[in-house]
Amino acid sequence: MIEITEEFGLNAGRVWRTLNSCGPLTEIQLIEETGLREKEIYAAIGWLARENKITRDNGLYRLDETNLNTEIGEDAGKIWQILSTEGELDTIHISRLIHRDERSIFSALGWLAREKKIQLKRTK
């Protein structure tokens, strides 16, 4: 069984390979080309942003130095602060606390997973 953090990294590799072979793609195209679900794409984007490998311009993602540090990095910082004080929380609770949508939460979790700052558990 693969742990979720490892899964995020594998999915990030899948997104990277897809962008490397196909060029710039929208989120919908990334989902179609990779076969990943939305949450998995968002976490992979966060992981790649932390690695400074992905950028988004006019709704298209491509491989390049990231321009997502402010957006994803700030959300990751907020989540890190909350988890440091509150302990274990689910994504719905985190979303309510920082007033961000699911896309933002999963991107930030991908960022934090790449930094090895969090442990994720899959719920049923």
Where does each model-flagged region fall?
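A local structural micro-motif
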Residues: 27, 39, 56-57, 91, ...
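Short amphipathic alpha-helical interface segments
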Residues: 7-33, 72-97
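Long, charge-rich, low-complexity alpha-helical segments
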Residues: 97-98, 121
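Short loop/turn and capping residues at structural boundaries
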Residues: 30, 42, 58-60, 94, ...
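Short alpha-helical segments that sit at the start of domains
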Residues: 1-14, 55-80, 107
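A short, conserved structural fragment
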Residues: 49-59, 113-124
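Short amphipathic alpha-helical interaction segments
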Residues: 36-47, 100-111
